[in-house]
Amino acid sequence: MSEIKDVIVQGLWKNNSALVQLLGLCPLLAVTSTATNALGLGLATTLVLTLTNLTISTLRHWTPAEIRIPIYVMIIASVVSAVQMLINAYAFGLYQSLGIFIPLIVTNCIVVGRAEAFAAKKGPALSALDGFSIGMGATCAMFVLGSLREIIGNGTLFDGADALLGSWAKVLRVEIFHTDSPFLLAMLPPGAFIGLGLMLAGKYLIDEKMKKRRTEAVAERALPNGETGNV
């Protein structure tokens, strides 16, 4: 159970692919102009990570070490092609919005990295969980960045959600404030870099605060009974 918990915590927070490893920045910065686009690409990446980790882990004993990377890429490309066709069939509006960034998941360092670092060494169940956790960590980072950029740039949230979730999702669109013209800095790549930088700073501050609390808790437990640690 502790290993399962560690895999989940590492994927979602401690080893977050976007905020710690800084992998997959090209789609992260390019696609997150809206929360819907960010969520769509994040979920697609999560599905690819989960399926490729599961497949590669299952076949790891029959994969020659000398040609393992080409085999990994072939497996990843097959899964990405299937996911791309699913999005094209059932969410065509999202397919048009994401464009080239769906097939580019094949070359995403996150996917290949987890295949080599984790799936090739662990069992199928744990590898699938690792892929799902890493994918959801990246999805959360993309969604937060996309939401911030959409709110600041357009004053809306979940604009175009029907392209991802169907016609019923039109009710999810929220207008935070009205604007006649978008704030282009937030919508263009410079806004993505600024937003990502703020998120990195926020994660650092949270980690430092949590580390300080743990240190104080350990120090209090180490004190003899009746002492408070104050001079």
Swiss-Prot record:
InterPro entries: NqrDE/RnfAE, RnfE. Coiled coil: none annotated. GO terms for cellular component: plasma membrane. One of its GO terms (biological process) is electron transport chain. Its main location: membrane. Pfam families: Rnf-Nqr. The keyword Chloroplast does not apply. It is an enzyme of class 7 (translocase). Keywords: Cell inner membrane, Cell membrane, Electron transport, Membrane, Translocase, Transmembrane, Transmembrane helix, Transport. Its EC number is 7.-.-.-. The chain crosses the membrane at residues 18-38, 39-59, 63-83, 86-106, 125-145, 182-202. It is found in: Cell inner membrane. It is a multi-pass membrane protein. Belongs to the NqrDE/RnfAE family. The complex is composed of six subunits: RsxA, RsxB, RsxC, RsxD, RsxE and RsxG. Part of a membrane-bound complex that couples electron transfer with translocation of ions across the membrane. Required to maintain the reduced state of SoxR. PANTHER family: ELECTRON TRANSPORT COMPLEX PROTEIN RNFE, ION-TRANSLOCATING OXIDOREDUCTASE COMPLEX SUBUNIT E. This is Ion-translocating oxidoreductase complex subunit E. It comes from Escherichia coli O6:H1 (strain CFT073 / ATCC 700928 / UPEC). The lineage of its organism: Bacteria, Pseudomonadati, Pseudomonadota, Gammaproteobacteria, Enterobacterales.
